Amino acid sequence: MARVCQVTGKRPMSGHNVSHANNKTKRRFLPNLQSRRFWLESENRWIRLRLTNAALRTVDKNGIDSVVADMRARGERV
């Protein structure tokens, strides 16, 4: 399964580990993905989303129905 947030679309990004001697080696910054179940009152069912902690805060702020509506408008299947 891809390490991609279903709500925000955040993906792993690349960068460097930098030592004290300023040597650089490649590394990946992974998104803080969480798997959560949400109750959709309008459809009377549970949905499971794989989202980042930032997206979880968006769900808390805007509500799951609004977030799911935005996802469906983008063409994502929920």
UniProtKB/Swiss-Prot annotation:
Entry keyword annotation includes Ribosomal protein: yes
Disordered, as annotated region: 1-26
Gene Ontology CC annotations of this record: cytosolic large ribosomal subunit
Source taxon at top rank: Bacteria
Pfam families: Ribosomal_L28
Keywords: Ribonucleoprotein, Ribosomal protein
Gene Ontology BP terms: translation
InterPro entries in UniProt: Ribosomal_bL28, Ribosomal_bL28/bL31-like_sf, Ribosomal_bL28_bact-type, Ribosomal_bL28_sf
Record-linked Gene3D superfamilies: Ribosomal protein L28/L24
Listed GO MF terms: structural constituent of ribosome
Keyword Ribosomal protein: yes
Family (UniProt): Belongs to the bacterial ribosomal protein bL28 family.
HAMAP family noted in UniProt: Ribosomal_bL28 (MF_00373)
Name by which UniProt lists this protein: Large ribosomal subunit protein bL28
Organism: Nitrosomonas europaea (strain ATCC 19718 / CIP 103999 / KCTC 2705 / NBRC 14298)
